[in-house]
A protein has these predicted regions:
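P-loop NTP-binding core
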Residues: 1-311
Length: 311
């Protein structure tokens, strides 16, 4: 089982739409897919057609990641009603905001990772839709992830947010979860022939090099229509929707290639403990641990994004 977080530290870049597009690509390929909705707006839950009252949600899982709670928080998406395969969602909740502490403890950020050990054999791919912030929910998602896909739009503020995201991922990788890495930067909502957009795309390619994925998603109404109708883009009619679906297939291929040589099993409880430095104490915050473990000269703010990731 592989885990991919879809993230951006800037809101409004189409992060949830990208997460759903990737889920559509994985589902259409026959992968057993789980989407975890950690964004308190719960748009991924709605987009997957999971509407109603639920006994358990992500908020409950993050409070107590026990086997029965984890399984009750996962429901089937309406996407799979007329197709074979698995596409499920761990239901989002506004109550998850209680777990979005800007200074989460080590115990708190490990809870989603613990929860995923309860469904290790049930899924091939887990996609996490994260909030547009670097607080507890996003860090919890990253600790449980193998890769982070950074979604960016071609704008100045998005470029700045992308830089912050890269450095934050690298800080967490060095301090707590060595398997974590950036899959790449996906440029979304490109407006063709818009000079400012073209300038920012070129700027990102010059700044981040190979981190910028070759696939660029243009702003198209078909994608918004499919998402708004709680339908998978791969099942939405029309030539344009099939072109969009093919682009998400390309991004999924990049993810699967990145996962190819990686261990798929989640670490056991003993292994998780072994990964932690011995000086981490119960109740210590993640920021305290990362600051304590930093070595002189390792400040990611002094490195380029490519250098920070060892590229």
């Amino acid at each position: 089982m592989h885990v991919l977080s879809v993230s951006s530290l800037k809101g409004g870049v189409g992060k949830t739409t990208v997460a759903l597009g990737l889920a559509s690509a994985a589902f259409s390929r026959g992968l057993r897919t789980l989407v975890i909705d950690l964004d308190t707006q719960c748009d991924a839950t709605t987009g997957l057609g999971a509407i109603g009252e639920f006994s358990e949600t992500t908020a409950d899982v993050l409070q107590a990641p026990r086997h029965n709670i984890v399984h009750r928080a996962i429901v089937a998406s309406s996407w799979g009603k007329n197709q074979s395969g698995t596409i499920d969602v761990m239901v989002g909740s506004p109550r998850s905001q209680a777990h979005d502490n800007p200074y989460p403890t080590i115990n708190e950020v490990w809870r989603l990772e613990i929860a995923l050990t309860k469904v290790e054999r049930d899924y091939d791919l887990v996609i996490i839709d994260t909030p547009p912030s670097i607080n507890g929910l996003t860090r919890t998602a990253w600790v449980a992830s193998d890769r982070v896909l950074i979604v960016a739009e071609p704008s100045l503020f998005s470029v700045v947010a992308t830089d912050r995201t890269i450095h934050a991922v690298e800080e967490l990788r060095k301090g707590l979860t060595p398997r974590l890495g950036v899959l790449g930067i996906l440029i979304n909502r490109l407006k063709p022939f818009a000079p400012e957009n073209e300038f920012r795309v070129n700027e990102m390619r010059e700044k981040y090099g190979s981190l910028v994925l070759p696939t660029v998603l243009e702003e198209r109404s078909a994608l918004q229509q499919a998402t708004g109708s709680a339908r998978a883009i791969h099942s939405w009619p029309g030539q344009t929707s099939q072109e969009i679906a093919a682009q998400f297939d390309e991004v999924l291929d990049s993810a699967l290639e990145s996962f190819a040589n990686q261990e798929t099993r989640r670490p056991t409880r003993a292994e998780r403990k072994a990964q932690r430095v011995t000086r981490i104490m119960r109740g210590q915050t993640l920021d305290q641990v990362l600051a304590f473990e930093a070595e002189p000269g390792d400040d990611p703010e002094e490195q380029s994004p490519a250098e920070a990731l060892g590229l």
